[in-house]
Amino acid sequence: MSVKGITPQELAAYGIHNVSEIVYNPSYDLLFQEETKPTLEGYERGTLTNTGAIAVDTGIFTGRSPKDKYIVRDAITQDTVWWADQGKGKNDNKPLSQETWTHLKGLVTNQLSGKRLFVVDTFCGANADTRLQVRFVTEVAWQAHFVKNMFIRPTDEELAHFEPDFIVMNGAKCINPNWKEQGLNSENFVAFNLTERMQLIGGTWYGGEMKKGMFSMMNYLLPLKGIASMHCSANVGEKGDVAIFFGLSGTGKTTLSTDPKRKLIGDDEHGWDDDGVFNFEGGCYAKTIKLSEEAEPDIYHAIKRDALLENVVVLPDGTVDFNDGSKTENTRVSYPIYHIENIVKPVSKAGHATKVIFLTADAFGVLPPVSRLTANQTQYHFLSGFTAKLAGTERGVTEPTPTFSACFGAAFLSLHPTQYAEVLVKRMQAVGAQAYLVNTGWNGTGKRISIKDTRAIIDAILNGEIDKAETFTLPIFDLAVPMALPGVDPAILDPRDTYADVAQWQEKAEDLAKRFTTNFDKYTDTPAGAALVSAGPKI
């Protein structure tokens, strides 16, 4: 079966001209050679580590740059996108004019013209009926490596008939000198055009912009078809029972869904349709700060040849110091999903989810380590999306900061949050799924809840022990909390017990409850939202 490939004429149709060479869907061995060439300079050059993986630096952008995200406002997006200027809550969907888009596209295509380019054709979505066929164009070898790791790799037979639905042109080396007069945030840009089905990247080298860019597009397209689009990890047990884990970056999605007793469907982005839960991706993008073989053996052993490390400190002998966060706390590794042994094969999808877990990192030390949610509480806490932003996943965030992020992923929502909540709850109700709120953050001791206790809590959810446990109701938040769970320190289940004086918890709880209420006000302009207020905290 011959691979279709791409011609200079096709690139010319995108505005890229006089390309010196096209390296189409390079193999991992070729990428290894390309990204370690001694002639490479700056952020293009990769360093071989003693793990066998290549390490690269992404410069000043060691996380996404949400303030530089734009979507062209036109006939298609005008009345569908959840725009940042509607005053209905924080999101990053700033409108862009067609005129400015044309200018940005010119900057990127000029940057890529006349160069030796890497073109990688991939799928986003494991379900053949709804997947996007995405073509990435870049002049940087390791960026091609990143998308080969993170997206689904087509077979030669699939490549023979590949017709891209979406084009991503990465012009990391170019910047926009006209940003001030165009009313933009900075010289850097991550811009989307849903009519042209294209993403442009300029000024930032961070690999995650390509990954999350396509997630934002799936978040636009799927819910409009009644398919849940979710910022979650997912795994499946021996009996076919599926669990999904929602949570912002760093709350434990990847760690907790990587379980030796269960097969991994995926670690970050999924859909849920009439057939069940399916992965959008073909790889994992795990945080590596303070990574150890003992705490996270699966991720640790996935860091080998073909994995790509970002912004880690590499010692002169090639050793990686995972404890060194001097470049960023948001050190990462991408690797193809088959680097994890315990995965769903051959396609990353399974049946319907029966357990839905909301992960939160409570910086206030108020919420219990686990609680069982009612149907209305499920919608309330999904729309609230309370967590603490953890260090380094966005520029300018270095300490844990309490935040509310709708659907545990407001930064990636292209539609109004209520649309995601409605689709999720509909899917849950159809199969009788149960939701739980799990706090992986802090308590009154000032310390983070141990991974050992959190893992035991997850085990109790997955094996059904939590549903047999006696519960008490935590005041203010009205949460049903188990009194005891196997393998969990009983002293932490009631957060009030972790304080020397319960009045300290009460004061913090009232403060947090007010924040929940204030945040949720923006959803009460609809009857459905107003009906959920009673599921929230009461002071």
UniProtKB/Swiss-Prot annotation:
* InterPro entries given in the database record: PEP_carboxykinase_ATP (IPR001272), PEP_carboxykinase_C (IPR013035), PEP_carboxykinase_N (IPR008210), PEPCK_ATP_CS (IPR015994)
GO function term, MF aspect, one:
ATP binding
Q: Which residues bind substrate?
A: R64, Y206, K212, R332
Cofactor dependence is on:
Mn(2+)
Signal peptide stretch: none
Keywords associated with the record: ATP-binding, Cytoplasm, Decarboxylase, Gluconeogenesis, Lyase, Manganese, Metal-binding, Nucleotide-binding
Pathway(s) of this molecule: Carbohydrate biosynthesis; gluconeogenesis
- Residues that bind ATP: 212, 231, 247-255, 296, 332, 448-449, 454
Cofactor comment text: Binds 1 Mn(2+) ion per subunit.
- Reactions catalysed: oxaloacetate + ATP = phosphoenolpyruvate + ADP + CO2
Where located?
Cytoplasm
Q: Which GO terms describe its biological process?
A: gluconeogenesis
One GO term describing the cellular component: cytosol
Top-rank taxon of the source lineage equals: Bacteria
Q: What family is it from?
A: Belongs to the phosphoenolpyruvate carboxykinase (ATP) family.
Q: What does this protein do?
A: Involved in the gluconeogenesis. Catalyzes the conversion of oxaloacetate (OAA) to phosphoenolpyruvate (PEP) through direct phosphoryl transfer between the nucleoside triphosphate and OAA.
State the NCBIfam families in the record: pckA, PRK09344.1-1, PRK09344.1-2, PRK09344.1-3
**Subunit info?**
Monomer.
Name of the featured protein = Phosphoenolpyruvate carboxykinase (ATP)
